Amino acid sequence: MEQIAARVTYINLSPDELIQHAVKNGEGVLSSTGALAVTTGKRTGRSPKDRFIVKDEQTADQVAWGNINQPVEQRTFDQLWERALRYLSERAVYISHLQVGADDNYFLPLKVVTEFAWHNLFACDLFIRPSGDHANGKPSWVILSAPGLKTDPERDGVNSDGAVMINLSQRRVLFVGMPYAGEMKKAMFSVLNYLLPPHDVLPMHCAANAGQSGDVALFFGLSGTGKTTLSADPHRFLIGDDEHGWSATSVFNFEGGCYAKCIDLSQEREPMIWNAIRHGAIMENVVLDENGVPDYADARLTQNSRAAYPREHIPLRVENNRGRPPDAVLFLTCDLDGVLPPVALLTKEQAAYYFLSGYTALVGSTEVGSVKGVTSTFSTCFGAPFFPRPPTVYAELLMKRIEATGCQVYLVNTGWTGGAYGEGGERFSIPTTRAIVNAVLSGKLKEGPTEVLSGFNLTIPKSALGVDDHLLNPRKTWEDVSAYDARAQRLIQKFRENFEKFKVPAAIREAGPSDVH
């Protein structure tokens, strides 16, 4: 176990104690909700250009190196790790012993060492607090977080004044100059996404919940497309809102908490999230008024305002943080072109095609420096920034799991219809999408009459309880059918161009869109 020398060391403080320290240290203030409110300066989202993975003998042939998984030498990592240790040795540090992964076979013990008390609270909220000594002899991973230490690109071999470095061989993750706490959870997500596939576990960027009878649903999607909102269902039990593993026998949460977007949060539309933001939670970059009341509509700090809270703040939750293999898998796509249906039933090959494509939109992007507003993107596996191995590794595991369980996969458009974004189209309302999801989870959607949507070759239902029939076929929602066809053809061409980079069996390639006719 890594020994940490510091001026003062606080070990395994309770959330209450960490909140007291954070307020006393001037790291944040208590809001009217009871949640701790903090700000993170210029870094209000992830910094993908500042994220590196150590390239060594173990990882050289296993990681898909490039702009997402940037390589860094062991020597460069070691020098910065030592600099961070020296920096922290002159300060008070906070240490918590946690774990990631709710499955006894696949969890990782985790030692979190932070300069800020609120970063340690974030780790306690988002990771899993084990009961007793639960390491079972497993070697522990170590997170070192020194947001007050800045990097020098020339001296430290990095790109800016901050860096995230993941050392998969040494089980170390380093954060320097990174006040945005979301970096911590996504770094450990990347670690599990690297480690689990050789153990026949599919890691997934998805939310998961369970019905009264134990039936499990998975919601894949990028930030802002509806994972957290749709999985926080008043009639179902939450497993988790963002990161899960799918083994041969179960679905299990990687985390012990939720990290919800707060922009335009409404008590009426999202009561479970609203009520979870209370004492013990953290509000990150949420604007407060002079009375400490949060204004969730105020985006002056960022569109990516967040709340971190433990699963215990959600009354309807699966206690053991896991469930059986899924009965339904939903790919949430936010279509800005307004040409995809609100729901489609996918074959196994189509599931692999749309999983690899990961077509969606960046809605209030989680990345620093992103363009304000909304832009479309193809994000492999519905989470390209977090998957270190080649994408086909994950796609093959997905097909294997679908084949073994026979679960139905659905494509659900939470984006626009009747026209494109900014060109007369309207976004599907949350109640409409919830009705679609309810129809999926009832099992009735796949039993009713269907038709095929030309061009995309998608099987779509002719009716769904609680949804206007005319919304189900996107071609019928456009006033000008020829304008729909032209826009659909344009998107189909984008799909084809994006898919050229994948080396996959013909059956998967042919499951994609063809020309509109």
Swiss-Prot record:
SUPFAM superfamilies: PEP carboxykinase N-terminal domain, PEP carboxykinase-like. PROSITE patterns: PEPCK_ATP (PS00532). Pathway: Carbohydrate biosynthesis; gluconeogenesis. Gene3D superfamilies: 3.90.228.20, Phosphoenolpyruvate Carboxykinase, domain 1 (3.40.449.10), Phosphoenolpyruvate Carboxykinase, domain 2 (2.170.8.10). Mn(2+) binds at K186, H205, D242. GO terms for biological process: gluconeogenesis. Binds 1 Mn(2+) ion per subunit. Involved in the gluconeogenesis. Catalyzes the conversion of oxaloacetate (OAA) to phosphoenolpyruvate (PEP) through direct phosphoryl transfer between the nucleoside triphosphate and OAA. It comes from Coxiella burnetii (strain CbuK_Q154). It catalyses: oxaloacetate + ATP = phosphoenolpyruvate + ADP + CO2. HAMAP family: PEPCK_ATP. Monomer. One of its GO terms (molecular function) is phosphoenolpyruvate carboxykinase (ATP) activity. ATP binds at K186, H205, G221, L222, S223, G224, T225, G226, K227, T228, T229, E270, R306, T433. Its EC number is 4.1.1.49. Substrate binds at R46, Y180, K186, R306. This is Phosphoenolpyruvate carboxykinase (ATP). Keywords: ATP-binding, Cytoplasm, Decarboxylase, Gluconeogenesis, Lyase, Manganese, Metal-binding, Nucleotide-binding. PANTHER family: PHOSPHOENOLPYRUVATE CARBOXYKINASE (ATP), PHOSPHOENOLPYRUVATE CARBOXYKINASE ATP. Its cofactor is Mn(2+). The keyword rRNA-binding does not apply.
